[in-house]
Regions:
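Feature for soluble, non-membrane regions of globular proteins
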Residues: 24-231
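Bacterial N-terminal signal peptides
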Residues: 9-20
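Glycine-centered signal
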Residues: 2, 20-21
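Bacterial N-terminal signal peptides that target proteins for export
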Residues: 1-11
Length: 231
């Protein structure tokens, strides 16, 4: 990608955020926290580039957080955990749905990636994946298809049912499977952001290449811990 093209694309990214106090953290109610990124911007190279990570975390995620704080300020939603709000999302303002989802989804996303990621899940999670999908390779193929075929912007998810079995789904925009508006509800244990801002600087329109690269940074111990906690 040329420097000129990068400059144009970054400009488009910035224009699309449309957040006040851009890149500056807003005061937050007790239940909301903008957590530090758990690794350096360049830590996931060469699979996810540093420039994308910096823009994604410092501008996009920060923007969702700032707008969420403003959306709940002075309402009965202020101070309540997002997971509680998600159960009645169909009754709440669109600004809470978009920015609450954006903040929660990205907080999970950063944690389920690691510079020491990749490989295969072990233990109970590995067994659950095999039981639910037949094999790890079959799971990867199904998840990759969900991510690659999600039209427009959205997320692909690995989720847990109440009985401990796993399923794959995708959601549009910043929705997630905890929301009562989701086509299929469950507990997400990891997700992949397939908005263009997550990959376009490096992969352009090759979303499939981005999805394939993602497997090299999946933090399986973190995903396993989330699975165990949800049981």
């Amino acid at each position: 990608m040329t420097n000129k093209f990068k400059a144009v694309w970054i400009g488009c990214l910035g224009a699309g955020l449309a957040v006040a106090a851009f890149g500056q953290e807003a005061p937050a109610p007790a239940a909301l926290e903008f957590e530090p990124l758990p690794y350096a911007f360049d830590a996931l190279e060469p699979y996810i580039d540093a420039q994308t990570m910096e823009i994604h975390y410092s501008r996009h995620h920060q923007g969702y957080f700032n707008n969420l704080v403003k959306a709940v300020a002075g309402t009965d939603m202020e101070g309540k955990p997002l997971e509680d709000l998600f159960t009645r999302m169909s009754q709440l303002p669109v600004s809470v749905r978009n920015n609450g989802g954006g903040h929660w989804n990205h907080t999970l996303f950063w944690k389920v990636m690691s510079p020491d990621g990749g490989g295969m899940p072990e233990g109970e999670l590995g067994e659950a994946i095999e039981a639910s999908f037949g094999s790890f390779d079959a799971f990867k193929a199904q998840f990759g298809a969900a991510a690659a075929t999600r039209f427009g912007s959205g997320w692909a998810w690995l989720c847990m049912n109440a009985d401990g079995s796993l399923f794959i789904t995708s959601t549009p925009n910043q929705d997630n499977p905890l929301m009562d508006v989701a086509d299929r509800q469950g507990t997400p244990i990891f997700g992949l952001d397939v908005w263009e801002h997550a990959y376009y600087l490096k992969y352009q329109n090759q979303r499939g290449s981005y999805v394939e690269a993602f497997w090299n940074v999946v933090n399986w111990p973190e995903v396993a811990a989330r699975y165990a906690a949800a049981l």
